[in-house]
Amino acid sequence: MAQLPDPQKLLRNFSRCSNWEEKYLYIIELGAGLAPLSDAQRQDGNRVSGCQSQVWIDLASNEQGNVVLHGDSDAAIVKGLIAIVFSLYQGLSVREIVELDVRPFFASLALTQHLTPSRSQGLEAMLRAVRARASALI
């Protein structure tokens, strides 16, 4: 998997895009950098309900107590949204993930105004899924 940008770099890169077409292309590019999921990770238990597209998110913690995230979707833009979500949570502990409110970050991207309602609902479902799965590891 390509290294995901940290939230500040992601915000800078996003703001450098001159229009929403470029921003969508950047989101898709981020998603293309995600490592493919194994068949074991593509199980029903990792499927995120509430998304129009097929979405899988696998969450585990490593020896240092930091969360390791893997995800995939059958839709390129959604896969990019997964990458954005992962960039916010990468390297954090399960407790930090549960306590972190990422909605202000997404508000600063103005994503919800430019996503279809079903994509916005899917993004919320992904955020809820990550937090719920992190909570289960506490």
UniProtKB/Swiss-Prot annotation:
Pathway(s) the chain acts in: Cofactor biosynthesis; iron-sulfur cluster biosynthesis
UniProt xrefs under Gene3D superfamilies: 3.90.1010.10
InterPro entries per the UniProt record, alphabetical: Cysteine_desulfuration_SufE, Fe-S_metab-assoc_dom
NCBIfam families reported in the protein's UniProt record: PRK09296.1
Function: Participates in cysteine desulfuration mediated by SufS. Cysteine desulfuration mobilizes sulfur from L-cysteine to yield L-alanine and constitutes an essential step in sulfur metabolism for biosynthesis of a variety of sulfur-containing biomolecules. Functions as a sulfur acceptor for SufS, by mediating the direct transfer of the sulfur atom from the S-sulfanylcysteine of SufS, an intermediate product of cysteine desulfuration process.
Subunit description: Homodimer. Interacts with SufS.
Family, similarity comment: Belongs to the SufE family.
Official protein name in the record: Cysteine desulfuration protein SufE
